[in-house]
């Protein structure tokens, strides 16, 4: 379950 929040952290 990939959370969108994690993606934001990469940004």
Curated annotation (Swiss-Prot):
Subcellular location: Secreted
InterPro entries in UniProt: Tachy_Neuro_lke_CS
Keyword DNA-binding applies: no
Tissues where this protein is expressed: Expressed by the skin glands.
Signal peptide interval: none
Record keywords, A-Z: Amidation, Amphibian defense peptide, Neuropeptide, Pyrrolidone carboxylic acid, Secreted
Organism name: Physalaemus fuscomaculatus (Neotropical frog)
PROSITE patterns named in the record: TACHYKININ
Methionine amide PTM positions: 11
GO CC terms, sorted: extracellular region
Stated family: Belongs to the tachykinin family.
Keyword Secreted applies: yes
Domain of life: Eukaryota
Single GO biological process annotation from the record: defense response
Name of this chain's protein: Physalaemin
Function: Tachykinins are active peptides which excite neurons, evoke behavioral responses, are potent vasodilators and secretagogues, and contract (directly or indirectly) many smooth muscles.
């Amino acid at each position: 379950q990939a959370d969108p929040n994690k993606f934001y952290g990469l940004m």
